[in-house]
Amino acid sequence: MRACPFLLLLLLPLLLSLGRIAAVRDAAGAGPERRQDDSVSQVQKLREEPSKVRDLQVKFIVRTTPDLDDADCYITAGQDHLLDDCNFNVSAKTFFVIHGWTMGGMYERWLDTLVSALQEREKEANVVVVNWLALAQQLYTIAVNNTRVVGKELAGLLDWLEEKKDFQLKNVHLIGYSLGAHIAGYTGNYARGIIGRITGLDPAGPMFEGADPSRRLSPDDADFVDVLHTYTRETLGISIGIQMPVGHIDIYPNGGDIQPGCGLTDILGTLALGEIGDLVICEHERSVHLFVDSLVNKDKQSFAFQCTDSGRFKKGICLSCRKNRCNSIGYNIKKMRNKRNSKMYLKTRAGMPFKVFHYQLKIHVFSYKSLGETEPSFSVTFYGTSGDSEPLPLEVSDQIGLNYTNTFLVYTEEDVGDILRIKLTWESTTQSWYNFWSQMKNYWSKPDPSSKELQIRRIRVKSGETQKKAMLAVEFWELKSTCLKMVKVEKHCSRPL
């Protein structure tokens, strides 16, 4: 039975304090021998007897089947015969999957799913699970210290493999979850050569946030480092996933904050079922499932867009693909090494396939008359060549700008194709808003301020995925209505991704 990870949220501040106290005590009262990391000495002792593979605290399991129960083939540095026994192909692409901290001493359920997806996508590749459960099932602070030990062990294995004739580090892809992401970083730091790629799946935040690059995952650890951040929201002053960018590309699905399917409504349902453990890990593990999604749904790849912060992305400002400002996420990501901003953002669905379709709306409001203090809520419905959308809410972060182009981000879960027309709707319980619209021939006529509350010239729509643009004008309007229907008046234009 798995221990409840919810305790982590309550105990992390205490664990961190205990770790600091223990470090101060050891430094003040212990001799040089006592200060030596016990885990390091234990692993070093075991390395002197490499034949006792099952006794090692770090095991490298070659997965020949998706089922963990059937996986019983280990490789270790210096034991050439184990490569043959495990059918390890030194010339093939090799994945190393590295799990994170554990409270129950067991593999997490996502590992089977990820291994199976890798084997299905790359049938000739080696898939190796780095089993460090014995060192991970410790107090969090101790497990953090053990990540360096595991990184050194894996680096030693890679150095040994690199001595083989056809083995190349550029074909190695380390995939680390939570603490496992930082283990991948240490591995790249300690290995003699340059590892091809590291993917960090929501790297752990506590004790790594703000740390020196040599003490956490960083862009220097591989030829290419990509990171998915899915749990960067602080709880009790601590973020479970690291908030800072630590790769060449750092992707923040849904702002790295609340993930669809992990919100308040889902919390209440989960509590009713008594599955609080699944609730807490929902956002943290979402990074794994997004990566799996990129492996199994090749025809439904999610796109992310470069932006300086989540706030600007939510306003729809950052849907450009110029100069490599957009990219697919997960396994199929295009390698880019940004020297400045590496942050990218996207919206997702609550489950696989996670892909959504992003749209930027630009609405120029010439004038309006507010009849109350509360802004109305807006929604828009798309009618396209492939289908229609549900009403999509427009998030108004500030007041509607007068004589100003207001930009919004909306997204659909299904592809509606090219936009043919849209319906703009607004409503409020505390005030009335009326629309004003006319054909272009009537646009320059003087409006009647006593009856016309909202004046819009036209709406521009841009698709993030296709980069197609459309301009829409009025189809018809009713003076007392809160609904405005518009049709495309110009042919769309597109810019290739």
Curated annotation (Swiss-Prot):
A cellular component annotation (GO) from this entry: extracellular space
Catalysed reactions, semicolon-separated: a triacylglycerol + H2O = a diacylglycerol + a fatty acid + H(+)
Subcellular location: Secreted
Principal localisation: secreted
Annotated positions binding heparin: 335-347
Gene Ontology molecular functions: heparin binding; lipoprotein lipase activity
Disulfide bond annotation, renumbered to this chain: 73-86, 262-282, 307-326, 318-321
Listed SUPFAM superfamilies: alpha/beta-Hydrolases, Lipase/lipooxygenase domain (PLAT/LH2 domain)
PLAT domain segment(s): 357-492
Tissue expression per record: Expressed by the venom gland.
Signal peptide: 1-23
Keyword hit for Lipid metabolism: yes
GO biological process, one term: lipid catabolic process
Keywords: Disulfide bond, Glycoprotein, Heparin-binding, Hydrolase, Lipid degradation, Lipid metabolism, Secreted, Signal
This protein's record includes keyword Heme: no
Record function comment: Has phospholipase and triglyceride lipase activities.
Protein family: Belongs to the AB hydrolase superfamily. Lipase family.
Subunit structure of this chain's protein: Head to tail homodimer.
Listed name of the protein: Putative endothelial lipase
